[in-house]
């Protein structure tokens, strides 16, 4: 395991143990709903299903098609806020 991987695992463990990971996930869900991200992705899913036909689309197909667009559509302000929260948490709980 690389040094970077170990650090990520440690951070993830600390976020999980302290309950911060769940709080961040809830914040992310709320922010994405608030900015219309979920509605945009839902509409894109419907477009993909219409284009390919319901019988020809699997959940895996949708995930492959939607994931890149979903990542791009997350507003920078949401990304920055989450990153700020993670940094603040780590600064407060640094050992």
From Swiss-Prot:
It comes from the Eukaryota. Transmembrane segments: none annotated. GO terms for molecular function: transcription coactivator activity. Its main location: nucleus. GO terms for biological process: chromatin organization; mRNA export from nucleus; positive regulation of DNA-templated transcription; protein transport; transcription elongation by RNA polymerase II. GO terms for cellular component: DUBm complex; nuclear pore; nucleoplasm; SAGA complex; transcription export complex 2. It is found in: Nucleus, Nucleoplasm. The keyword Transcription applies. Belongs to the ENY2 family. This is Transcription and mRNA export factor ENY2-2. It comes from Salmo salar (Atlantic salmon).
């Amino acid at each position: 395991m690389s040094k970077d991987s170990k650090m990520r695992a440690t951070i993830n463990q600390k976020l999980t143990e302290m309950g911060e990971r769940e709080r961040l996930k809830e914040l992310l869900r709320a922010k994405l709903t608030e900015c219309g991200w979920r509605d945009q992705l839902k509409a894109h899913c419907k477009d993909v299903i219409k284009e390919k036909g319901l019988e020809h689309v699997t959940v895996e197909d949708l995930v492959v098609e939607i994931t890149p667009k979903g990542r791009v559509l997350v507003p920078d302000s949401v990304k920055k806020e989450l990153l700020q929260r993670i940094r603040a948490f780590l600064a407060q709980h640094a050992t």
